Amino acid sequence: MVLKTELCRFSGQKIYPGRGIRFIRSDSQVFLFLNSKCKRYFHNKLKPSKLAWTAMYRKQHKKDAAQEAVKRRRRATKKPYSRSIVGATLEVIQKKRAEKPEVRDAAREAALREIKERIKKTKDEKKAKKVEFASKQQKVKANFPKAAAASKGPKVGGGGGKR
């Protein structure tokens, strides 16, 4: 028979079936505590990393040396082959790597110049549209008689200003 154990959210100790206190926060997050001591410390916002009897403290201060020795770290080995990047074959990458710095700089500057020209072109187009729109607005304003705008009555009312 296998017992389903859970871990205390504060102390990190095992909680066996029929034990523990379940706390459900207003955001529907469930916390399971081993006993009222863990629950009380959690609600008082004590940090489990500062209490010597909790699992978090023991882990931070390297107290469980026996468990750490069991976990062997596997050394990351570099793979001997070289993979091609999506969109570029291995030959293209080798060719670019062999390229002289002067050629690379010239290509970069040409690309930057092209981008700047494109940005300048879009700015000029926006300016032209803006000028055209402003001239249309002035024509529309010129069509309205000034007397119609001035014939408004005096402003009346308390106005909802600040006190």
UniProtKB/Swiss-Prot annotation:
Q: Where is this region: Disordered?
A: 119-163
| Null allele phenotype | Abnormal leaf patterning, with the abaxial mesophyll features appearing in the adaxial mesophyll domain.
Per UniProt, the ranges with Basic and acidic residues bias are 119-133
What biological-process terms (Gene Ontology) are attached? adaxial/abaxial pattern specification; auxin-activated signaling pathway; gynoecium development; leaf morphogenesis
Ribosomal protein as UniProt keyword: yes
Give GO terms: molecular function aspect only: mRNA binding; structural constituent of ribosome
Q: Would you name any one GO CC term?
A: nucleoplasm
Q: In which tissues is it expressed?
A: Ubiquitous.
- Give the record's keywords alphabetically: Cytoplasm, Nucleus, Ribonucleoprotein, Ribosomal protein
One Pfam family, please name it: Ribosomal_L24e
- Which cellular compartments is it found in? Cytoplasm; Nucleus; Nucleus, Nucleolus; Nucleus, Nucleoplasm
Gene3D superfamilies this protein is in? 6.10.250.1270, Ribosomal protein L24e (2.30.170.20)
Task: Name the SMART domains on file.
Answer: TRASH
Record keyword Protein biosynthesis present: no
Q: Which InterPro entries match?
A: L24e/L24_sf, Ribosomal_eL24, Ribosomal_eL24-rel_N, Ribosomal_eL24_CS, TRASH_dom
Under the heading PROSITE patterns, the entry gives:
RIBOSOMAL_L24E (PS01073)
> What does the annotation say about its assembly with partners?
Interacts with REIL1 and REIL2. Component of the large ribosomal subunit.
Task: Please explain the role this protein plays, according to its UniProt record.
Answer: Might have an extraribosomal function in reinitiation of translation of ETTIN and MONOPTEROS genes that are involved in the auxin-mediated gynoecium patterning. Essential in leaf polarity establishment, probably having a role for translation in leaf dorsoventral patterning to specify leaf adaxial identity.
Provide the protein name: Large ribosomal subunit protein eL24y
Which source organism does the UniProt entry give?
A: Arabidopsis thaliana
